[in-house]
UniProtKB/Swiss-Prot annotation:
It is found in: Endoplasmic reticulum membrane. One of its GO terms (biological process) is tail-anchored membrane protein insertion into ER membrane. It comes from the Eukaryota. The chain crosses the membrane at residues 15-38, 115-130, 169-187. Component of the ER membrane protein complex (EMC). Pfam families: EMC3_TMCO1. Belongs to the EMC3 family. Residues 2-14, 131-168 are lumenal. Residues 39-114, 188-261 are cytoplasmic. This is ER membrane protein complex subunit 3. It is a multi-pass membrane protein. Keywords: Endoplasmic reticulum, Membrane, Transmembrane, Transmembrane helix. GO terms for cellular component: EMC complex; endoplasmic reticulum membrane; membrane.
Length: 261
């Protein structure tokens, strides 16, 4: 038999639930713009820019090579894929994996990430836990087992309380992870306000992702270009153009009116 249902004071909604939602939302907005101010542009070397342009040229050749004559296509393909001295065959780049302990730029980016992500969560979470501690804020609309009590009822030590009720501290963390769609709607998909995404990147190491291996990119592009054959798309363009009724007769029958001043 279920126990009596709890009735929450309406002031809890006004002075606890809504303030936590508003504070969490604006902290995320501030974090987004602070991250924009603190982010540093990654400097590219001349070699990296040149390699990226070569890959773009090869991809354009694969996609639009059908609009140039076959000899021109084969000449460009020979430049890239010649087995002896083709660009993708002879060019070998030295890939040096960066070390965060020796690269001051990576250390600076890590510190900026901690300042904009970890520090606000600790400060705001501690302040909310101290200010709004002990409140039962809301209830999830489905029953839960007792295993969810430590996650949803932080700061409330009531063994007889149903696990579906949410404490104020847990309500803050639910907002941290639940406002992702709101941030994407207002700030766009790639925003710095999504604290849960930033936490996942730091835990998985995506924030310090290794740069792409240029040699592997060259090999992949070489294989793709090697499988590309020339299919002349303008083979019968003259016949198709002459077969179309372009209605030129009306253009030469119009009299041009001139005025003499």
């Amino acid at each position: 038999m279920a126990g009596p249902e709890l009735l929450l004071d309406s002031n809890i909604r006004l002075w606890v639930v809504l303030p936590i939602v508003i504070i969490t939302f604006f902290v995320g907005m501030i974090r987004h713009y602070v991250s924009i101010l603190l982010q540093s542009d990654k400097k590219l070397t001349q070699e990296q820019v040149s390699d990226s342009q070569v890959l773009i040229r090869s991809r354009v050749l694969r996609e639009n090579g059908k609009y140039i004559p076959k000899q021109s296509f084969l000449t460009r393909k020979y430049y890239f894929n010649n087995p002896e001295d083709g660009f993708f065959k002879k060019t070998k780049r030295k890939v040096v994996p960066p070390s965060p302990m020796t690269d001051p730029t990576m250390l600076t980016d890590m510190m900026k990430g901690n300042v904009t992500n970890v520090l606000p969560m600790i400060l705001i979470g501690g302040w909310i836990n101290m200010t709004f501690s002990g409140f039962v804020t809301t209830k999830v609309p489905f029953p839960l087992t007792l295993r969810f009590k430590p996650m949803l009822q932080q700061g409330i030590e009531l063994l007889t309380l149903d696990a579906s009720w949410v404490s104020s501290a847990s309500w803050y963390f639910l907002n941290v992870f639940g406002l992702r769609s709101i941030y994407s709607l207002i700030l766009g998909q790639d925003n710095a306000a999504d604290q849960s995404r930033m936490m996942q990147e730091q835990m998985t190491g995506a924030a310090m992702a290794m740069p792409a291996d240029t040699n592997k990119a060259f090999k992949t592009e070489w294989e793709a270009l090697e499988l590309t054959d020339h299919q002349w798309a303008l083979d019968d363009v003259e016949e198709e153009l002459m077969a179309k009724d372009l209605h030129f007769e009306g253009m030469f029958k119009k009299e041009l009116q001139t005025s003499i001043f």
